[in-house]
Every structure is written in C-alpha cells, then in structure tokens.
Amino acid sequence: MATAEIDDLIEKLKTTSVSPANTTNLLCEISATKDPKLFDKHELAECFLGLTKCDDTNVRKEAAKCIAEITKSEVQRKKFTKRNIIAAFLECLRQVPTSDGSMELPIQICRALGNICYLNDEARDLILELEGDAVLLRLLDITTIEDVANAAQFIKVRGGLLSNYLLGGEGLAKRAMELGVMKKLQGIIDIGASNVEQHEDLLLNTLPLLSILTENVSDLNFDSSLNIQLSRILAASTNPDLAEMCLELLHYQAESDEVKLILAKDGLCETIYNLLEKYKTLASTSEARALMKLACELIVLILTGDDSMHYLYTTPLLKNMVDWLDSTDIDLLTTGVLALGNFARTDSHCIYFVEQQTMNKLLEVLAKNNGVKDDVRLQHALLSALRNLVIPKPNKNAVIQAGLVQTILPMLEIHQPPVVFKLLGTLRMTVDGQEKLALELLKNKTLIEQLVHWSKSSDYAGVTGESLRLMAWLIKHAYLSKIAYALPRKGDAPAEQIADKIPLTQDYDRSSLSEFLANEGTVEAMVSMLTAQHLVMQNEALIALCILSVVYLSQPSEAAQAQLLQDELVKCEVGKKLAELISKSSDTMTKEIVENLQNCVNLLKSSEQLVAHLEQHNINELLKSIPILTEYCTL
C-alpha cells in the first residue's frame, strides 16, 4: 500500500462520520498494511482512543487490532504511550472474561498493550502507576476459556503481554512477586504438566515468564514441587523448545545444592540420560546439538553437589556414565568423563574406580585424545578425573603402572592454559611420595625445560604456579628421604618422620638432580618461588632450596657442582628474595615455614661465598624480626 493511500485512509477515519460497518472496513484496511512505519508521520493516538470506546464491539476489536499493528513501529509506540490510552486498555482487561465469553477483543487489547510495552519503560511505568500490573497478572487466573476457537491465541498474547511488561527489570519483577505471580504460574504449570502434549502451547507461553523472573529476581528459589514438575515436563515433552526452557530453568535452580539433591532423587539425570540415548543420532543441527549440550551440562551440574553425587553413586547413572566412555559422540563422551570426575571426589570412590578398571578406560580415552588438535574440553575433563583418581595413596602405583605418565607427557605440546593447568596438577599429585617417578621426571629434559618456560612466560597465573610447584615437588619427593638426616633443625613434617628411620649415609645417586640443574633457569625458578603469593608455595621453595644445599653445598665430593650452584644462587639474588620473603610474609608465617627458613639460611651459610651474599642483605637481622621467633624468645 502506497503512502498516499495510507494518508487517504487516515483522513477518512479522522474526518468522516461513518457507520460502524464502514469504520470497521477502514480499520481492516489499515491493519492489513504490511509496513507499520508507513504510519509514523501520523498522530493517531487520540483518534484510535475514541474508537476503542465505541459502543460497537467490532469497531473496538478492529481498532485494537490496528493499534497492535501500528505500534510495531517504535515511533508509534511512543505516540501511543499515553496515560488515558493505557488506562482504557487496562479497564477493558479488567472485564475479562467478558460476559459473552468471547476472547476476540481481549486478544487484540493484549496485542496492542504488549506491543506498546515492548522496549518501552515509559509505558511500563504508566501501567505500574495505574496499578495495572495487578490487572495483567489477573489474566493468569483464567484457566478455563469458553471461547475454544480463540483459546490458544489468548494464551499466546497473554504470555507476550506479560513478558514485554516484566522485561522492564528488577522492580517490576519484584512487584509481581509481591502480587503472587509465582503461585499463579505454578497453578498453570500444574495444569500443563498433567498432560504435556495437550497443553504444550500453554507451557510454551508460560515458562518464559518464569525465565524472566529468574533473571530479574535475585536468588529466586522455586518450590520443590515446581522443580519436580519441570523435570516431569522435560521427560514427557517431545518439543525441543519446551525441553530447552525446562533445561534452562532447572540449570538455574540447580545452582542450589538442595535442589540438586531433589532433582537427583526425582530421577532427572536418568531422564536426561534416556532422552539423550533416544535422540543422540538426531542431533545433526546446531540447535539440536546446543540442546544436547545443555542437557549434558545439567547432569554434570547436579553431580557437583556432594549429597546429590553420593546419592547418584548408588543409582544406575554411575554405570551409564561409564558406558558413555565408549561413546563416539564427543559431548556424551565428555559428559561421561566429567561425571566420573565428580564421582571421584572421595577416596573410596577413587579406589573403586581403579579396582574396577574404570581408570584404565579413562586412560584409553586420553591416549586417543592427547594431541594438540584434540578436543580441549575433553582433555580438561580427562585430566581432572585422573588427577582425582591419583590422589589416594593406594591408587598411585596402580595408576603409574597403567601408564598415566607416558600418556600425559605428550600433552606438554599443548599450550591451552586450562589443559596445561590440569596436566601439571595431575603430574604433581602423581609424584607425591613416588621417589622413583620423581627421579625419572627430574631427568626429563623436555618436561623441565617446559616447566621453566611456563614458570616465566605464562599469562595464566595458575600455570605459572603449578609449573613452579611441580619442580619443587619433584626435588622434594626424589631426595627428601635421602637427606632428611642432614637438616640442621626439624622443619618440614615429612623430614621429621623420615629422619629417625634412615641410616646416616650420604651415598646416593645425585644424577637426577644434576641433570635437573643443568637446565637453564631451574635454580632461578626455585629462588623466584620464595616470593610467591601463597605461603604454601613459599614453604615448598624453602624445602627445595634446603635439599639443593644439602646435596651439593655440604659435600666435598661435589665441589664443582657446588660452585656452579653457589654462583647461580648469587646470580639469582637469593639473599634479596629471602629478604623480600621475610619483609612481606613474616607476620603470617607459620612455625613450619619459619623453621624451614632457618634451615635454608643455615644450609646456605655452609658456603663462604653465600655467607657474604646473605650478609649484604642483612638476613641475620631480618630473621630476628620475625614475630613468631620474637614470641619464642619472650617466652
């Protein structure tokens, strides 16, 4: 329709006193216009306000329909944002359901008011001032609609109107909560859940309101019965849009550990498993794949709760997740791994997984996916699970024998920070108490060079810290048992336990440590670790330096290596780092750290070169200033 024709229609509508039938015809022509922007130059609000008050129902209905079409334009939305127009619409909605049961006029009023409210805070504020929110919410009480032919359309536009209104933000959502919106929505959802297929449209146009409230009301917790209904709707529905809404709502609710347990006990994870097994071959579109991932993520989220994890450990879900380790679908495979990683949060579960060969299946999957081009999310999940499995002492030897280290060392070529972080953490947990393995890894030039590189250059603090810690742990677990007797004071707890048991011998193989030190930057890494942010890392650095000092500085037979170590320690300004450590951390030092600090300083003093270096940085005086030592002296 051309602009001139639009102008003519509007002129006729404004200036001609015509019969209701002719008015209706004019309105029908206007509402049939495809481009609402054609009306932007016209001032139509007052004209249409009069028409909405006409005695003729058809005129009122067509006028409301025209307003709904015209206000699809932003310009006209603003022009129709008038108190008297919105008040008239609200008055009309107060009469719903109408005396004759017809929903045609309420449908058009809902459309018109809904379009006016779209991205229009001024209109929403007017509704609030007129206490129209109570009128809008009362529409949710209409559960039986006599006008069967228009029932579906009313349900749709009611949902659209309320959505456009509630999208106005936190204030409107909270006011709706005060007016009992949740009880009204729960009533509708109960009806929908009673027969999901029959009430699909009702649910599709009601659940978005829950989503809006969830986004705008902080810490909105649904009643447990509502969460269970959402779970049941998910199980019964074949509509992907409805499934997506249920999953998103349950995702938000499942942030609560209490809800995780409720959903676990209601069988939600098994429901999702069965649905994914049923539809996995159909996930060929990006939308279907996104829905599948959302469902997978909900299983994992529920398993992050302690109580829900322990409950699900006793259900068939455990075997289902193990079965997914054989899946060729990357999302199901990754979910299976993530699920098992969450199950592996207790020693007893971890030991069971090793005994049942589940650990071997995880290693098999990792062996096929440990390259630079493989899926990063899967790699991260695998390393997380294996890290948990290797923590219990009874598991360590079995996991090492199964080839964990050989499988993950090729992953040093991967430089994705989350994967590297988990890789280093897994190795660190594996070498805990494993002297033979620690000795082997100290000789692994590729590993040590990469650790030095990451300790200096990573933008990811976690990778920097894990690189330093792994080097310190390798030194500690390879040599602490050999040199504990030589420590001048009791310090690190393991040293105390070992010192009474080992023979006073100095005959041990230093080749692993020598090869470690031959890599440029290793001594610097341990020295730099002294001023790490975390006390535990400072302590680990002190222990590593104590071991280096005992192995080389106190042994005449190691004069050449001792000189190299002394030169390197001076070059790295170990005195300056120790001074920084004392100055920054003395107030928070534990007794254990102080003892290890004293051990370290005393051992360094076995070298005249280092005595002079430490004096330059006033280490002796700084040691006296440590509060915990001052307290001992006072006592």
UniProtKB/Swiss-Prot annotation:
One annotated GO molecular function: guanyl-nucleotide exchange factor activity
Record's keyword terms, sorted: Cytoplasm, Endoplasmic reticulum, Guanine-nucleotide releasing factor, Mitochondrion, Repeat
Subcellular location: Endoplasmic reticulum; Mitochondrion; Cytoplasm, Cytosol
ARM repeat placement: 72-118, 346-391, 392-432, 510-550
Disruption phenotype annotation: RNAi-mediated knockdown perturbs mitochondrial distribution and dynamics.
GO cellular component labels: cytosol; endoplasmic reticulum; mitochondrial outer membrane; mitochondrion; plasma membrane
Gene Ontology terms: biological process: muscle cell cellular homeostasis; regulation of mitochondrion organization; rhabdomere development
Quaternary structure, from the entry: Interacts with Miro.
Function noted in UniProt: Probably acts as a GEF (guanine nucleotide exchange factor) for the Rho family of small GTP-binding proteins (G proteins) that stimulates the dissociation of GDP to enable subsequent binding of GTP. May also chaperone the processing and/or trafficking of small GTPases independently of GEF activity. By interacting with Miro, promotes mitochondrial fission in response to high calcium concentrations.
Name by which UniProt lists this protein: GTPase-GDP dissociation stimulator vimar
Organism the protein comes from: Drosophila melanogaster
Gene: vimar
